[in-house]
Amino acid sequence: MNTEIPWQTAKQYEDITYKKCNGVARIAFNRPEVRNAFRPRTTSELIDALRDATEDTSIGCVLISAEGPSPKDGVWSFCSGGDQRVRGKQGYVGDDGAHRLNILEAQRLIRFMPKVVIAVV
């Protein structure tokens, strides 16, 4: 019996993967080389994917997971938090030059999403 899920890429990103299949959206952190630590780009992409999943009437459930394992040591990590290597003295700076990490907006979207959200850790 084939248990492979036929995920289809919903949108291309650099720091996350975003796929859909049969009413389920899968958003995964995709920076295993840094234990899936997030940076401003990661949160911007996460917010964009969460908004898309919210607006897509064919989606009833959103899975949040992570890619891996780390190419350094083979260890799997869901997310290690903010990437301290890109954090400056003034905090995180987004691609637009604004000082922020904007993770609170991602948390708000998850909390108030009118669909089931599951962290696959």
Task: Show which residues each predicted segment covers.
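Glycine- (often His-adjacent) and acidic-residue-rich active-site loop
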Residues: 10, 34, 66-109
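A short, small-residue-rich loop immediately preceding and capping a beta-strand
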Residues: 114-121
